[in-house]
């Protein structure tokens, strides 16, 4: 597994996982070399203690028990636990990193992780506990705990003791051979796995935002020059060009967008004050510029996540080619932490854009087209989308607060051995929350746009792209004339948005 598409197919589509023969060779050579090399040398985590206790030599007869002690003592997570897709992603990332043959781990550990994925056995891993350097020690300890046959897992929808599930499916717990405890725990695999999951949903959010933005431009019969190739190619940013091109593609068959030359360049206007807007509001007109920055950020973040996913994030690093063991800090999560902070900022930007577009639709003083709150009932007696706007505004505000960076919130710990840490897992977890919030706001926007389409009676004039998602939404959420309890519809719309397939 070397690219993001493979990651998605395994994590979300339950594609079976196997260790390639070349990887098996590298894994075995690395293990055999380290086992021989470490016999008369001081190797961190093999014959020493860990962290600030590394100055203590561990007797040969205690070295295997040391690994069990590490796993059990660091299985100390708390709070909520990660969902199945995040844990699968974390297992896959750890498996992939250790398969590079740079960790001196026994192949049994890697094969057992493959078995967890293939049997859809999900270890119980808690959200709280990771500081992002020495990797995701606490969270990955819970993975290692399951691999040695202890702890708890989710299997077939139930939370159960690992030992019971292993017995049921015929798996044997991992036996420690050399340094499997440290190698399983000492890396960035939870934050990287969650980062990959976050990216999966970030792509969906971006595509939906482009679709909703184009739909609103249709509703208000915008001029098409603000997403034209000529205007957007005048700037050098790839993302802006891609978003503008996507808007043109989506709107190619729309009967509602207009050419400025047909209306404002005719020389027929003699008014001093124009009743019609000469230019659309920024939330409609500046979509390529706003979402272009989001597009480029997501693309860059995906590259960094792919690189980390295919990196040996362990310590020490075993190099068979030079016959050496190198001690350093490849477990440090700075790359992922920084990228997750950037990703949550641009997802919050998506949320802010959606909230402003929603406000535009709900306020007749600025859209000059729709009834207040897109109310299809009796004004004053019915409320339309008034109630859900509060939810959208509140959720957007929460995202704005959550977008403060984790990357700069290092707190020294481990007797100051870890005197600067990445907080990468916290960053990825907060980003996950921001993404979930964004889906809630976009669900409200989607329902509101659909209401506006029905009120205007313009369905037949819309682009095929807008009609397609409108039809999909209407299978879940009806046209609302009378006041209804809204929260079930919001959840249905959110589920629809999250389940959509993404193709850029």
Task: Go through each PLM region and give its residues.
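C-terminal auxiliary extensions adjacent to catalytic cores
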Residues: 1-15, 19-26, 30-33, 37, ...
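FAD-binding core of FAD-dependent oxidoreductases
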Residues: 44-58, 62-66, 73-98, 126-148, ...
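Glycine-rich, flexible loop motifs
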Residues: 1-40, 65-126, 217, 230-233
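Mid-sequence acidic-hydrophobic segments that form the walls
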Residues: 73, 93-97, 112-123, 128, ...
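Well-ordered mid-protein domain cores that form the structural environment of catalytic cofactors
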Residues: 92, 100-122, 129-140, 145, ...
């Amino acid at each position: 597994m070397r690219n993001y598409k493979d990651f998605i197919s395994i994590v979300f589509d339950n594609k079976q996982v196997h260790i390639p023969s070349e990887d098996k060779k590298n894994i075995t050579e690395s293990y055999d070399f380290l086992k021989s090399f470490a016999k008369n040398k001081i190797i961190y985590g093999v014959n020493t203690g860990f962290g600030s206790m590394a100055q203590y030599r561990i007797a040969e007869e205690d070295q295997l028990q040391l690994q069990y002690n590490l796993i059990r003592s660091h299985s100390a997570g708390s709070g909520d636990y990660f969902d199945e897709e995040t844990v699968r992603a974390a297992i896959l990332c750890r498996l992939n990193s250790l398969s590079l043959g740079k960790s001196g781990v026994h192949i049994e550990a890697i094969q057992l992780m493959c078995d967890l994925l293939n049997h859809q056995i999900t270890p119980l891993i808690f959200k709280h506990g990771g500081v992002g350097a020495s990797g995701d020690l606490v969270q990955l300890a819970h993975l290692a705990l399951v691999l040695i046959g202890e702890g708890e897992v989710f299997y077939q929808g139930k939370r159960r003791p690992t030992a019971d599930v292993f017995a049921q499916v015929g798996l044997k717990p991992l036996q420690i051979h050399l340094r499997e405890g440290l190698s399983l725990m000492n890396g960035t695999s939870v934050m990287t796995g969650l980062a990959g999951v976050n990216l999966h949903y970030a792509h969906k959010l971006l595509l939906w935002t482009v679709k909703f933005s184009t739909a609103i431009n249709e509703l208000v019969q915008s001029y098409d020059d603000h997403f034209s190739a000529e205007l957007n190619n005048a700037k050098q940013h790839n993302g802006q060009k891609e978003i503008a091109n996507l808007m043109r593609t989506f709107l190619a068959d729309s009967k509602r967008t207009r050419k400025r030359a047909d209306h404002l360049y005719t020389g027929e206007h003699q008014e001093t004050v124009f009743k019609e807007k000469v230019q659309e509001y920024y939330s409609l007109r500046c979509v390529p510029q706003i979402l272009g920055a989001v597009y480029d950020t997501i693309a860059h973040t995906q590259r960094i996540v792919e690189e980390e996913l295919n990196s040996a994030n362990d310590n020490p690093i075993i190099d068979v080619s030079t016959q050496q063991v190198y001690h350093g800090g490849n477990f440090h999560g700075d790359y992922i932490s920084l990228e997750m902070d950037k990703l949550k900022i641009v997802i919050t930007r998506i949320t802010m854009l959606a909230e402003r577009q929603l406000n535009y639709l709900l306020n007749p003083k600025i859209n000059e087209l729709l009834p207040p709150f897109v109310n299809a009932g009796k004004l004053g007696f019915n409320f339309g989308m008034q109630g859900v706007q509060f939810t959208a505004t509140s959720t957007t505000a929460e995202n704005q607060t959550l977008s403060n960076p984790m990357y700069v919130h290092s707190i020294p710990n481990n007797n100051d051995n870890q005197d600067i840490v990445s907080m990468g897992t916290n960053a990825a977890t907060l980003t996950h929350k921001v993404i979930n919030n964004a889906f809630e706001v976009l669900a409200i926007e989607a329902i509101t746009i659909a209401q506006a389409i029905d009120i205007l009676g313009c369905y037949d004039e819309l682009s095929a792209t807008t009609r397609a998602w409108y039809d999909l939404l209407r299978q879940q959420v009806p046209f609302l004339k009378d006041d209804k309890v809204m929260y079930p519809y919001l959840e249905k719309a959110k589920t629809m948005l999250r389940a959509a397939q993404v193709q850029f």
